[in-house]
Amino acid sequence: MVGGNASGWIVGKEHYDLGNDLFTLMLDPYMQYSCGYWKDAATLEEAQEAKLQMICEKLQLQPGMRLLDIGCGWGGLSAYAAKNYGVSVVGVTISAEQQKLAQARCAGLDVQILLQDYRDLHQQFDRIVSVGMFEHVGPKNYRTYFNVVERNLAPHGLFLLHTIGSNKTDMNVDPWINKYIFPNGCLPSVRHIAEASEGHFVMEDWHNIGADYDRTLMAWFERFKQAWPQLAPRYSERFERMFSYYLNACTGAFRARCVSR
């Protein structure tokens, strides 16, 4: 994370540990807190399941493979891959709330959910995936990130990175988002990713679905508004205004194509 190991845990504590009730009500059943794939989808649920299927197919998952899910969130992708593709999954998160719910979601499946910094991993996996986590790594740690992925990936393995990206190479940190939503976050550019991964990987596929984030964020906002009466006893009106602004501001950025995915 931008400032080292400690700052990554700040993100987990301040945002992802807000409460599983908030995210359960706002997100789809797989609790995907990243862009859905709306090509043939009519609902948020369909868009997120289509995204999960696309990820698993790009990874060419086969029964018996070992899959590492870096930044596994609430375990939606880990559970989907284990259930539908017969793979053995290790998911890592730095959020205690996410780990708790992910373990419950993956009960009975060949899935292990670890509360651990990804940099401490020393295993071998046939496939590695990371969805919506690279935004928290920071430019100073991009090379380390790809070093860790390469170290844990078996020869001839595949790695899929799914991240929001900026159209310019800079310290792409929004002051408001950094203060209120994602402390220490930073959006990578194409150049950032290409330079940091050089010497580690051959880029076989580049797929930009950033335009789909507009609909995803609007779906989250509608669900957040509908759920607010249930959430209001626990969260303040200030939080409601802040979170609504966050979802709508991000929608505007994707709609204007200022950022991509």
Language-model regions: role of each:
Residues 164-260:
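Substrate-binding/catalytic lobe of Class I Rossmann-like enzymes that use SAM or dcSAM, i.e.
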Residues 119-128:
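A short acidic, Gly/Pro-enriched loop at the edge of an enzyme's catalytic core
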Residues 108-118:
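Conserved SAM-binding strand-loop segment of SAM-dependent methyltransferases
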Residues 64-71:
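Conserved class I S-adenosyl-L-methionine
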Residues 74-85:
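Conserved SAM-binding loop of SAM-dependent methyltransferases across substrates and taxa
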Residues 143-155:
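A short glycine-rich, Lys/Arg-flanked "PGG" loop and its adjoining helix->strand segment in the class I
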